[in-house]
């Protein structure tokens, strides 16, 4: 097996490879819900994603034997860095996310590269995975691999959690939970009142989607 190389990327063509890798590596997972490709590209593109206006971002691709075998994004959200540490981020906190890797060796090399970049930028703490901001897909899936993700939550192979644990340096910072609701059952009285209130509000309109106006 050839040498593993990790390269910083930034051109439109390289960003497309970065995005496409997730589709390739998760194609066999029936519970992975592919994002719209256009939206995935915009997420990675300065000028399209407002996140770049207040963040430093560096994307990396891992290559071996002429093939792309992994990816990671290292980033510093300056709005989050300015927050009170009690809210979870704060001064000196950087992030990495959007990890994809063929195996543990590649994953660890990518994470090490992301950590090195964050150190060079003066960061002293990593809160990860974070893909990209806390308002996108934060956290690492540790339960629920047998069903698709809920809204705004990521879905990763079970082995990724093992890769992170194997590093030995990462400890859980917060538990994120999602909940299921049986929509065939009648809504509780409180929810019914909220819905009825909205229906009576003349400023609220519910319309069917007209794709011709997209």
Spans of features found by a protein language model:
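Short beta-strand element of the conserved SAM-dependent methyltransferase core
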Residues: 60-62, 99, 179
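Short low-complexity, flexible loop/linker segments enriched in glycine and/or proline
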Residues: 43, 141-144, 188-189
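Conserved beta-strand in the GNAT
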Residues: 61, 67-77
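Short amphipathic alpha-helix that is part of the acyltransferase structural core
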Residues: 1-47, 202-214
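Acyltransferase donor/substrate-recognition loop-hinge adjacent to the catalytic core
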Residues: 2-4, 154-214
């Amino acid at each position: 097996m050839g040498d593993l190389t990790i390269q910083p990327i930034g051109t439109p063509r390289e960003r497309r490879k970065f995005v496409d890798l997730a589709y390739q590596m998760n194609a066999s997972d029936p519970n992975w819900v592919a994002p719209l490709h256009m939206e995935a590209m915009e997420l990675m593109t300065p000028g399209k994603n407002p996140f770049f206006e207040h963040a430093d971002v560096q994307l990396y691709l891992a290559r071996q034997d002429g093939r792309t075998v992994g990816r990671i994004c290292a980033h510093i959200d300056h709005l989050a860095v300015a927050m009170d540490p009690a809210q979870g981020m704060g001064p000196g906190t950087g992030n990495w996310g959007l990890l994809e890797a063929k195996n543990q060796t590649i994953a660890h090399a990518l994470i090490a590269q992301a950590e090195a970049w964050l150190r060079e930028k003066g960061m002293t703490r990593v809160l990860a995975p974070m893909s990209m901001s806390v308002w996108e897909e934060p956290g690492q899936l540790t339960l629920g691999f047998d069903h698709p993700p809920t809204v705004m939550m990521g879905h990763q192979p079970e082995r990724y959690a093992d890769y992170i644990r194997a590093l030995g340096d990462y400890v859980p910072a917060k538990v994120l939970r999602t909940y299921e609701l049986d929509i065939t059952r009648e809504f509780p009285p409180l929810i019914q009142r909220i819905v009825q209130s909205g229906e009576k509000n003349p400023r609220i309109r519910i319309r069917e989607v007209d794709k011709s106006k997209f």
